[in-house]
Design a protein with these regions (language model features):
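Intramembrane alpha-helical segments
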Residues: 106-176
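Membrane-embedded alpha-helical segments that form the functional core of polytopic membrane enzymes
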Residues: 40-48, 52-85, 93, 117-121, ...
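Transmembrane alpha-helical segments that form the membrane-embedded catalytic/substrate-channel core
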Residues: 71-79, 141-149, 190-207, 240, ...
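Interfacial loop-to-transmembrane junctions
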Residues: 268-303
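Juxtamembrane boundary at the C-terminal end of a transmembrane helix
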Residues: 306-318
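Cytosolic, membrane-interface loops and tails of multi-pass inner-membrane proteins
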Residues: 4-21, 83-104, 200-228, 279-283
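Multi-pass membrane catalytic core of lipid/isoprenoid biosynthesis enzymes
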Residues: 85, 93-134, 223-247
């Protein structure tokens, strides 16, 4: 027979376990890692825009901007999962997502998503400026309303989805500056171009899953890998001049240009290595090349943005 203390300990342990599971479900619903990436890119845009104005970026405007962006991104993720719950349930990689597995109800997810997108956008419009709130709402609508349904119709969804996917650093810039300017567009271009090798690697790794769910990713429609590799290489090469655009505009200096060139050549090297999938017959090795490119992409972008911030306006410090 268990003592009261032991029973209490077991009850507390079960409650703690349920709480962890609950937290993990909502972290997955709101795509916490994607939301963090959006916040990081938005922070870079705000930081560079603030220094362009000659003011410190470390103010309430930064917190308001990042908080609003995080809320809208989380809401968009919830709406995306609501729309894709059936296809998610058909893929091994996503079958355990909370809405696909039925742990979070459809209505609950939709209400959370719509509320977060609406109130987050309104918050940004009020606390920063109307342009920033509008761009953030456009990002959410583009991602949920256009990109998500197009994934089942055409491989062009990846290209179209790259537009809302690249807006966060521009949103950070407009929050600091109140207008769309060429440096903000350059930040948009960096994120736009970066996405293609990144997503092609993901699509190649999980092409069987996408095929079973009826999602028209490039590796599904062109299974020989030629188009996947060609697109990846094209954008990886393009990444080199695009990453230097901020220096041409006077936002960053020569030290950044050196760092950006080295980083971009490294990104290109992993993309060239990814091209081995064209001749690789071992599916495990083919997947490994894609996984290595994916890892390189998620290391490359934060390092590139950090280099921008360290060398902003020609400085070599924050």
């Amino acid at each position: 027979m268990q003592s009261p203390a032991t029973t209490q300990d077991l009850t507390g342990s079960a409650a703690a376990s349920r709480f962890r599971e609950w937290m993990m479900d909502y972290a997955e619903l709101f795509k916490a890692r994607v939301t963090l990436l959006v916040v990081i890119t938005g922070a870079a845009g705000f930081y560079l825009g603030s220094l362009r104005s000659g003011i410190s970026p470390f103010n309430m405007g930064l917190l308001n901007t990042l908080g609003g962006m995080a809320v809208v991104t989380a809401g968009s993720a919830a709406l995306n999962e609501a729309l894709e719950r059936r296809s998610d349930a058909q893929m091994r990689r996503t079958a355990r997502r909370p809405m696909a597995a039925g742990r979070i109800g459809l209505l609950h997810g939709l209400l959370l998503g719509f509320a977060a997108v609406f109130f987050g956008s309104m918050f940004l419009a009020h606390e920063t400026n109307l342009l920033t709130g509008t761009l953030t709402l456009i990002t959410a609508v583009g991602y949920v309303g256009i990109y998500t349904p197009l994934k089942r119709m055409t491989t062009l969804a990846t290209f179209i989805g790259a537009f809302p996917g690249a807006l966060p650093p521009l949103i950070g810039w407009t929050a600091a500056r109140g207008m769309i300017e060429w440096p903000g567009v350059a930040l948009f271009a960096v994120l736009f171009v970066w996405q293609f090798p990144h997503f092609m690697a993901i699509a190649w790794m999980y092409r069987e899953d996408y095929a079973s769910a009826g999602i028209k990713m490039t590796p599904v429609v062109s299974p020989n890998g030629l188009t996947t590799v060609a697109q990846s290489l094209f954008y990886a090469v393009l990444m080199i001049p695009v990453s230097l655009w901020t220096t041409w505009l006077g936002v960053t200096g020569i030290p950044y240009s050196i760092a950006a060139t080295i980083l971009s050549l490294g990104y290109l090297w992993y993309t060239v290595r990814f091209a081995r999938i064209l001749k690789e017959t071992d599916p495990l090795k083919s997947r490994a090349y894609a996984r290595d490119l994916l890892k390189a992409s998620v290391i490359y972008l934060p390092l590139l943005l950090a280099a921008m911030m360290l060398n902003a306006q020609g400085r070599i410090f924050f």
